[in-house]
């Protein structure tokens, strides 16, 4: 008998490049069901990209193209202005790179998730969102787009015929209207594993979470993002998974 609830857990991986190491990808891949793999623009390089694709396939972890602004120096977290054609081309370029890597090992790219400043920008900016959507439609209109749950991009992408995966964050606080609390605000990040685990459980079961103002709020979740780029974060992910399993929630790929 299948568990009454299931949820996808995703994490940002493949972000090392050259001699610089970011995160503990092998450990995270043992825990999550989806891997957002950097495509070389905000982080990662050709060697790391292929290595991470191989590691994800070996664990039957779903592979996502983690596209970003062309900004290695700023780790893709700096706001940038783009001509429409350039953002379309760079989106195609990045997805194409990871698709090629996946093809060489008999794997497939199953979705696209923007990174950092691009993720935040297209959530609310119709013009940049349109460029990403256009690129995906040109390349593979069947490829789902993972975006912030409840953001304007959701309806925009659906109206253009894309499948949308709505994402929430276990370790981030939410406002009473279901938006992420800015990282500049005190209390924006949950460092207590138990708090993050309770929030993840609510997302997975359709329950309400507690906003930063103490109000109950329900946020739709097809996938939950977890971070595992340091030992403390890995422990948080393990606590989340233990809590989900204790409440009969299965961790598995989003449909």
From Swiss-Prot:
It catalyses: 5-oxo-L-proline + ATP + 2 H2O = L-glutamate + ADP + phosphate + H(+). One of its GO terms (biological process) is carbohydrate metabolic process. Keywords: ATP-binding, Hydrolase, Nucleotide-binding. Its EC number is 3.5.2.9. The keyword Nucleotide-binding applies. GO terms for molecular function: 5-oxoprolinase (ATP-hydrolyzing) activity; ATP binding. It comes from the Bacteria. Pfam families: LamB_YcsF (PF03746). The keyword Hydrolase applies. It is an enzyme of class 3 (hydrolase). Belongs to the LamB/PxpA family. Forms a complex composed of PxpA, PxpB and PxpC. Catalyzes the cleavage of 5-oxoproline to form L-glutamate coupled to the hydrolysis of ATP to ADP and inorganic phosphate. This is 5-oxoprolinase subunit A. The gene is pxpA.
């Amino acid at each position: 008998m299948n568990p009454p609830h299931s949820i996808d857990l995703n994490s940002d991986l493949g972000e090392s490049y050259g001699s610089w190491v970011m995160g503990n990808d092998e450990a995270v891949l043992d825990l999550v069901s989806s891997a957002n793999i950097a495509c070389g623009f905000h982080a990662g390089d050709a060697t790391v990209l292929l290595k991470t694709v191989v590691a994800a396939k070996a664990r039957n972890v779903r592979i996502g193209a983690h596209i970003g602004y062309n900004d290695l120096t700023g780790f893709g977290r700096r706001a940038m202005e783009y001509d429409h054609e350039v953002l379309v081309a760079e989106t195609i370029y990045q997805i194409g790179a990871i698709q090629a890597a996946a093809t060489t090992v008999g794997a497939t790219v199953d979705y696209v998730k923007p990174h950092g400043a691009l993720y935040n920008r297209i959530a609310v900016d119709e013009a940049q969102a349109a460029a990403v959507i256009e690129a995906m439609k040109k390349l593979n209109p069947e490829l789902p787009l993972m975006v912030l749950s409840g953001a304007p991009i959701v309806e925009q992408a659906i109206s253009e015929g894309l499948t949308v995966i709505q994402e929430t964050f276990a370790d981030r606080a939410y406002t009473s209207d279901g938006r992420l609390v800015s990282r500049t605000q005190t209390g924006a990040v949950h460092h207590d594993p138990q708090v993050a685990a309770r929030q993840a459980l609510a997302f997975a079961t359709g329950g309400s979470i507690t906003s930063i103002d103490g109000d109950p709020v329900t946020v739709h979740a097809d996938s939950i993002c977890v971070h595992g780029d340091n030992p403390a974060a890995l422990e948080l992910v393990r606590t989340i998974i233990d809590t989900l399993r204790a409440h009969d929630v299965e961790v598995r790929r989003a449909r």
